[in-house]
């Protein structure tokens, strides 16, 4: 087939794509069927096992045929100024992604795909409501080449332009990662409840044993969450390139993601209570329109796409913060604390509340058990909202919410003097307007990494 001017010929996905897509179902069927094999030793057991196995075999056969047909009718090419992907047998679908709208190109390699030497190329574009263009699957050697080609064309360069080099910023130690994840509240609280339940079962065997079963389910759930988080953030590394920050992570499913600097709406520095003796912090980013695909294939990526540093010492976190938001400091100046009467409204968190702003960023600090500081560039502010409940009105206090184009969270100046909030509302509105018309600072300035 002759390619159009500026385009390429139609290309298909790798022939082993159906095996990767249907491999999970085959494994699930195997795990369900194995327990029934024990009953097949008796003649009656063999008869009872025959029909379930037949049904599962039929489902696997139909699924395999469907996966093969889906692969056969899926093709893609670069057509002019668009990436075009056609798929579907009964319901034909043709997706066109303008190359100029591409914001990031990620590479995802699930376990089965990695074993077979395959990887998925996931194209994130603006204005698609969280949907991604997916090329699943290509060879592990072809995927980076396709990624480099798409990024070059998206930036108006020649298709043969190599991918810009990346500078290593930070690698998260896996030992510190598992220790930090284990000291989170959603892990320790179920374990503490489990200990109490065991003691209760020893003291009062009747009701205590009954409660132990329910608690055990909660503990297992916490363990699964811990293993999943470790699996997703294993061997976490951050690299910096001209197109943004590149994140490499994952144990079973390896992910190579890119977060463009321009899409970062806000950052949040967090420190759980039990991390404080070790000086560990966590850094998260809120990215505009960063959603998981509708088919759920992201494997938790909707949450992990906003994790920039899972756990690291304070100096390392501030180093990465400086690469994202240059000249952003998180030390509150004098007068950043709320008035003393705010202690009546927020007695537990009063000593951690603070809010301030400068020429480029607005800051808000909150927290009781877990400290959190949010940094929002003035140029990213979408709206400002003043909130004042009945208790706040009685105390002459108010809260100012700073909204961005992100989907996760924003900054909140809580329990401030109502006159101060009115002044902040006017000043931040004017500063945000000026910041949107000012040239953006470069995040690629030369710097020295912390020791």
Where are these regions (language model features)?
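N-terminal basic, Ser/Thr-rich segments that initiate or prime the first beta/alpha elements at protein or domain
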Residues: 1-451
């Amino acid at each position: 087939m002759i390619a159009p001017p500026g385009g390429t010929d139609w290309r298909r996905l790798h022939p082993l794509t159906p095996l990767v897509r249907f491999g999970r179902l085959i494994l699930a069927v195997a795990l369900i069927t194995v327990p029934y094999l024990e009953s097949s030793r008796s003649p009656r057991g063999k008869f009872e096992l025959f029909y379930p196995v037949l049904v599962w075999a039929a489902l696997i056969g139909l699924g395999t045929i469907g996966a093969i047909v889906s692969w056969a009718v899926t093709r893609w090419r670069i057509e002019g100024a668009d990436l075009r992907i056609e798929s579907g047998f009964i319901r034909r679908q043709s997706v066109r992604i303008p190359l100029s709208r591409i914001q990031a190109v990620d590479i995802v390699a699930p376990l089965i795909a990695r074993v077979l030497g395959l990887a998925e190329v996931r194209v994130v574009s603006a204005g698609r409501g969280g949907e991604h263009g997916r090329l699943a699957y290509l060879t592990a050697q072809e995927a980076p080449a396709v990624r480099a080609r798409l990024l070059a064309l998206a930036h108006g360069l020649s298709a043969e332009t190599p991918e810009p080099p990346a500078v290593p910023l930070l690698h998260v130690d896996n030992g510190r990662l598992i220790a930090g994840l284990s000291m989170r509240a959603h892990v320790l609280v179920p374990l503490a409840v489990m200990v109490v339940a065991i003691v209760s079962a020893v003291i009062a065997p009747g009701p205590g044993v009954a409660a132990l079963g329910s608690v055990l389910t909660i503990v297992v759930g916490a363990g699964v969450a811990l293993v999943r988080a470790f699996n997703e953030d294993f061997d976490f590394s951050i690299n910096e390139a001209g197109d943004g920050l590149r994140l490499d992570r994952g144990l079973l499913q390896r992910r190579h993601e890119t977060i463009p600097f321009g899409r970062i709406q806000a950052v949040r520095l967090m420190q759980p209570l039990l991390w404080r003796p070790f000086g560990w912090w966590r850094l998260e980013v809120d990215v505009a329109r960063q959603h998981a695909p509708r088919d759920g294939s992201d494997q938790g990526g909707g949450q992990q796409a906003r994790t920039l540093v899972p756990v690291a010492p304070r100096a390392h976190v501030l180093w990465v913060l400086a690469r994202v938001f240059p000249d952003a400091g998180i030390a509150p100046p004098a007068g950043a604390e709320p008035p003393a009467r705010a202690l009546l409204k927020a007695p537990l968190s009063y000593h951690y509340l603070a809010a301030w702003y400068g020429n480029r960023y607005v800051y808000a600090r909150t927290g009781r058990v877990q400290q959190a500081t949010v940094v929002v560039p003035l140029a990213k502010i979408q709206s400002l909202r003043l909130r004042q409940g009945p208790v706040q009105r009685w105390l002459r206090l108010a809260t100012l919410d700073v909204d961005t184009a992100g989907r996760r969270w924003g900054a909140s100046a809580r329990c401030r003097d109502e006159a101060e909030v009115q002044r902040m509302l006017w000043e931040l509105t004017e500063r945000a307007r000026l910041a949107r018309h000012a040239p953006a600072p470069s995040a690629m300035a030369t710097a020295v990494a912390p020791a």
